[in-house]
Structures are given as structure tokens and as C-alpha cells.
């Protein structure tokens, strides 16, 4: 699967369960660890867990074996390592505190085309 397709699989999985404020960062020129980061918010720890589980399920359904995941039990910040794509699902306060978009400033950013209604 192409990396851009995997990004879209992650975005679709997040949108399926109404993730908020989905942003993709192209970090190919910034780090050798991954090519893209997808960042999204869930409105509760339960939703963060559900969103993360859905991304993992959809990745596996598309033949991608996740390399690892962290934070699924806490529901505050789930990190999913899909290889060329790393997905961060967080509570809004956690996202604001760590401000990954600022940390990776200079990386090309794009928002998901379809944002779920609130």
C-alpha cells in the first residue's frame, strides 16, 4: 500500500467515528522516523480509545501490520505506529498542551477535507 493511501485509510477510520480537527503533517523532510503524522481529537477518553482501535482495525483490513501502539489504556493520548504513518489521537486539552503542530512547524500541513459535524 502506498503511503498516501495509508494516510487516507487512517483519516477515513477517524472520520467514521467522528474525530475532530484531523490534521496531516508531511514530515518527510523533517525526520527519518516516519513520512506523515495524522493528528486528531476525540471528545472523551472512551472516544480516543475507539478512534485508535478503529484506525488499527482498518489498517489491518488493508494489509498493514501496525508496528506498535501506546496509550490505548489511558485514553488521553494514543499513538499508533503504522510505519510510514504515525497517528496521534488525543483529548483536546492534551493536544493543546503538547501542540505537535507547532513542534513540527515548517512541515506541510493539511486538514481533512470532510470534517464531521459537531
From Swiss-Prot:
One of its GO terms (cellular component) is cytoplasm. GO terms for molecular function: ribosomal large subunit binding. GO terms for biological process: cytosolic ribosome assembly; negative regulation of ribosome biogenesis; negative regulation of translation. Pfam families: RsfS. Gene3D superfamilies: Beta Polymerase, domain 2. InterPro entries: Iojap/RsfS/C7orf30, NT_sf. Keywords: Cytoplasm, Phosphoprotein, Repressor, Translation regulation. The modification Phosphotyrosine is found at residue 36. The keyword Protein biosynthesis does not apply. It is found in: Cytoplasm. Belongs to the Iojap/RsfS family. PANTHER family: IOJAP SUPERFAMILY ORTHOLOG, MITOCHONDRIAL ASSEMBLY OF RIBOSOMAL LARGE SUBUNIT PROTEIN 1. Functions as a ribosomal silencing factor. Interacts with ribosomal protein uL14 (rplN), blocking formation of intersubunit bridge B8. Prevents association of the 30S and 50S ribosomal subunits and the formation of functional ribosomes, thus repressing translation. This is Ribosomal silencing factor RsfS. It comes from Pseudomonas aeruginosa (strain UCBPP-PA14).
